[in-house]
Amino acid sequence: MQLTSFTDYALRTLIYLASLPDNEQTNITDVTELFGVSRNHMVKVINRLGQLNYIQTVRGKNGGIRLNRPAKTILVGEVVRDLEPLDLVNCSVEFCHITPACRLKERLYRAKLAFLAELDDCSIAELLDDNAELLILLQKA
């Protein structure tokens, strides 16, 4: 399973925000420069993360973005579920005539559950725990 670039940058953004000292905020420009992504794409990512209440966005001169809740409470699987279309294949009878007898869809469903279970076992905070190399790379913003 491959995550969309949208989800990839959303996860990277959450990791970066979690690396900041408590209550410190950053801005979209810093995030776009850190990850080398277009500002337009990052604005969409930030807006969606704000809509989902993962981050707090503040407009204006002293505005910025920061996590809206502790990183230890944000599970990677939760973020992926919120952002990804998780239907691996289209198994509707209109699309595939073998659907009524197909055993693949059940295997794919179980594989998706296993994938998400693994991601549910990891919080954004855990990705930073004892990871000095990552913290150094994130400070380049």
UniProtKB/Swiss-Prot annotation:
Known cofactor(s) = [2Fe-2S] cluster
All copies of the HTH rrf2-type domain together span 2-129
Q: Which Pfam families match?
A: Rrf2
Q: Which organism is it from?
A: Vibrio vulnificus (strain YJ016)
The residues listed in the UniProt record as binding [2Fe-2S] cluster, with positions renumbered to this chain, are 91, 96, 102
Q: What is this protein called?
A: HTH-type transcriptional repressor NsrR
Q: Which domain of life does this protein belong to?
A: Bacteria
State the protein's purpose: Nitric oxide-sensitive repressor of genes involved in protecting the cell against nitrosative stress. May require iron for activity.
Q: Does the keyword DNA-binding apply?
A: yes
Q: Which GO terms describe its biological process?
A: negative regulation of DNA-templated transcription
Q: What InterPro entries does this protein's entry cite?
A: Tscrpt_reg_Rrf2, Tscrpt_rep_HTH_NsrR, WH-like_DNA-bd_sf, WH_DNA-bd_sf
Q: Which UniProt keywords apply?
A: 2Fe-2S, DNA-binding, Iron, Iron-sulfur, Metal-binding, Repressor, Transcription, Transcription regulation
Report the cofactor remark.
Binds 1 [2Fe-2S] cluster per subunit.
Which PROSITE patterns does UniProt cross-reference here? HTH_RRF2_2
What residue ranges does this record give for the DNA-binding region? 28-51
- What GO MF terms are annotated? 2 iron, 2 sulfur cluster binding; DNA-binding transcription factor activity; double-stranded DNA binding; iron ion binding
Task: Please provide, in alphabetical order, the Gene Ontology terms of the cellular component aspect for this entry.
Answer: cytosol
